[in-house]
Structures are given as C-alpha cells and as structure tokens.
A protein has these predicted regions:
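N-terminal targeting signals for export/organelle localization
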Residues: 1-21
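A short beta-strand-turn-helix
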Residues: 21-42
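Loop/turn elements at helix/coil->beta-strand transitions in domains of secreted/extracellular proteins
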Residues: 39-41, 71-74, 99-100
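Structural microenvironment flanking redox-active thiols in thiol-disulfide oxidoreductases
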Residues: 56-95, 106-113
Length: 154
C-alpha cells in the first residue's frame, strides 16, 4: 500500500478489496446494504461519541458530503460504540452536523469484517463497491490535497 503525498494516515490498496454483505442500520433500524449504492463513491466512517479525534473530524466530513464537486459521494458515519441513539443524536446536534445522519452497527460485525484497530477509521469504497483506500485515524476532510485526490473517484 502506498501513502498519499501530502496526507498522512491514508492507506491506498494496490488491489481494491471486495467485502461481501456490508450491512448496517439506519436510525429506524432499517438495514442498509452498500450494494444498493453501487455507482456512488462511498465513505464509511467508523466512530464513537467518546472518541475525541472523531469529534474533531466529523464537521469536516459533514462539509465533504455537501461539496458540490463531489456529487457522487455518499457518506455513512457508522457508530460502533454500541451507544444509544439519544447519545448519538446529541453528539450530532452539538457538532451542528447537517448533511448526513448517523448509522449503527450494534453487533460490531463491520469492525471485524474491516479489521478495524480503533476509531476513527474511514473506509473509502469505489463505484464498483470495492475498498480502494482507508484512513486510519482522523484527518481534515476539507484538506485541498484530500479533495483533489478523492475527486478522481467521484
């Protein structure tokens, strides 16, 4: 895996990885399957309310969803802290998050599937539904280098 010039924490896979049955829940406990979003650039951000770096990066991730240059992007912030929806909603309100809603993985199946070592970890999935890169730890998602790079996948 190669490091992206100018941005720490990004790991790019030489060969994109396929993950089957990437399923998680929305706030109404409805199942979301990423296969339904083939053709979109997907960002799965794994986080928890007690995670300070998650709190720092979430507003920039929220702005990324609203970026007009990235019309094919769909961001799923997936809580893997086994936290209540009240706690999660308060976290989003406190941070003034406007452009996406929280999602949940209560059994933390995805943490195992993606071999997550900690939060935040962000998985980047191309339009074919394959993981092509990941961010280990937090970054500023409004960083120009990041946006110029991610635009190529939009």
């Amino acid at each position: 895996a190669e490091e992206l010039p100018g941005i720490k924490n990004i790991v790019i896979h030489k060969i994109p990885k396929t993950h089957d049955n990437v399923i998680f829940l929305d706030k109404n406990d409805q199942k979301i399957n990423i296969n339904e979003y083939t053709g979109n650039l997907l960002i799965l951000n794994f986080w928890a309310t007690w995670c300070e770096p998650c709190k720092e990066e979430m507003p920039s991730l929220d702005k990324l969803q609203a970026n007009p240059e990235l019309d094919k992007i769909k961001i799923f912030p997936i809580n893997i802290g086994k936290e209540t929806s009240n706690k999660v909603n308060k976290f989003f309100i406190d941070l003034n998050i406007k452009n996406f809603e929280p999602y949940f993985d209560p059994p933390t199946t995805l943490a195992k599937m993606f071999s997550l070592r900690g939060v935040p970890t962000t998985i980047l999935i191309n339009k074919k539904g394959q993981e092509f890169a990941r961010v280990i730890g937090s970054i500023d998602f409004e960083d120009k280098n990041f946006i110029n790079w991610i635009k190529k996948y939009n």
